[in-house]
Amino acid sequence: MQVQVIVSQTLEGEVSTYVCKNNHVANLWYIDQTLESAREYLNGYEYDEHDPEFGKLQQLIEDLETGHYDGVARMAWDAWMVLCDIIKDDQPEGLEIECYQATVLEDWQVSK
């Protein structure tokens, strides 16, 4: 499966960056906000530190924070999916996970 980074620009010049996989688009700003919420969430959550899912989330957050952005789309999408899997069934109040369905990909410039 190919993961694409999509850049869209409004007439006013505002630029948004998205991650696209299987025609689903996630805005990187929302991923950043979700990670921020997840960090706060994990600080007050009784996770078993030996739980592999907990370790996976911690590693993804660390990689994103330290700028290991080689393959940014893959890393961001993986982080997105892990967060959705972990948090969706026990989503704390105020934490929103958003994902967009791409409908008109041809209207967006796909960055190389």
Q: For each predicted feature, which ranges?
A:
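Short aromatic-glycine-(Arg/Gly/Cys) micro-motifs in beta-strand/loop hairpins
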Residues: 1-17
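A short, surface-exposed interaction/processing loop segment used at functional sites
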Residues: 3, 28-41
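A short, exposed loop/beta-hairpin motif centered on an aromatic-Gly-Thr core
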Residues: 14-32
